[in-house]
């Protein structure tokens, strides 16, 4: 459900992944991202040959045997660093490692690794096409097409968007990207009417309606509608955190997490409430805050009727009824219903206190605790007693005081 809430810009990378396998049916030209799905589809045409692995050519008597073989190959397939010889079983980890060498030698070309199975498949499909890529074996009819393709491997991006400065390896990707700025959304979903600037994003969106999740984690079996979500998820198993803060050295698994963290150091709070003037570091916090003024709570729990201003809050609330606690501490085993609670809890083990007071230097494990502490310096007391007018800096102190009037 959460995946359906992602902004369109996060749904798909604009450029194709040279390491991602695509299987095309000779009968109907339908394409598949996973070979297991491709093998199952071939059965629908009937009279198929013995199932064969496109990577090594081995034939099998049953499709299930081929499926087991493919899983075994996937586990064994590794990426070897040409600079230091280190091998990786996951492509994402390999790419992160390659960045370290790229930073050491920024002038050198940054080539993307290609799995051997992709090279073998491309060579088989070459046919009579005379121009073949030396990196991945893919062949083309024209030399110009080959040159365009090679930019994927070299990292060359000569086509730059004059609106935002983002660069692309091929002109067609720039043209597709420019729809983001123009506001054009020609691709519309027949199910719900939502429109997209790129056809690929529509295809991914439609999986929300069909329930298709072609990208499965080999570690825990969890499936995703897009490859980028799987890559981010796999970091929860590997512990990989490729994005590091230059100020304090803290590492993050996602680039967006690093971007938000960096605002702590620069003190940036660009989002201001027009009603009361409160400022926020993130737009999502401002939107959530706005509901205090409007009182709007459009998302209601089917179990108890409690309403929420955000659908994500409803999803977390429903876990109270289901007992689902998907986020578990690897140190002590304590489980939580939301990831933010686990993040805060982990600091009790690590002793990390990332939120520091600019006035006195005192540090805190939670931003909310820092916000309360800051009122000591500012003198802010937002909670006022309606009976006697006495004001308090904290809500808990206000509630405790009100008991005096009740008794």
Swiss-Prot record:
Signal peptide residue numbers: none
GO terms, biological process: regulation of transcription by RNA polymerase II
Domain of life: Eukaryota
Family note: Belongs to the krueppel C2H2-type zinc-finger protein family.
Subunit architecture: Binds DNA. Interacts with GATA4.
Record key words, sorted: Activator, Developmental protein, DNA-binding, Metal-binding, Nucleus, Repeat, Transcription, Transcription regulation, Zinc, Zinc-finger
GO-annotated molecular function: DNA-binding transcription factor activity, RNA polymerase II-specific; RNA polymerase II cis-regulatory region sequence-specific DNA binding; zinc ion binding
Function: Transcription factor that acts as a cardiac regulator and an effector of alpha1-adrenergic signaling. Binds to PE response elements (PERE) present in the promoter of genes such as ANF/NPPA and acts as a direct transcriptional activator of NPPA. Also acts as a cofactor with GATA4, a key cardiac regulator.
Stated name of the protein: Zinc finger protein 260
Zn-finger (C2H2-type) residues: 23-45, 51-73, 79-101, 131-153, 159-181, 187-209, 215-237, 243-265, 271-293, 299-321, 327-349, 355-377, 383-405
Sequence ranges of Basic and acidic residues compositional bias: 10-21
Regions crossing the membrane: none
GO cellular component terms, semicolon-separated: nucleus
Pfam families per UniProt: zf-C2H2, zf-C2H2_6, zf-H2C2_2
Stimuli inducing this protein: Up-regulated by activation of alpha1-adrenergic receptors.
Subcellular compartments: Nucleus
InterPro entries: Znf_C2H2_sf (IPR036236), Znf_C2H2_type (IPR013087)
Gene designation per UniProt: Znf260
Broad class of the protein's primary localization: nucleus
Residue ranges, annotated region (Disordered): 1-21
Gene3D superfamilies in the cross-refs: Classic Zinc Finger
Tissue and organ expression note: Expressed in both embryonic, fetal and adult heart. Also expressed in lung, skeletal muscle and adrenal glands.
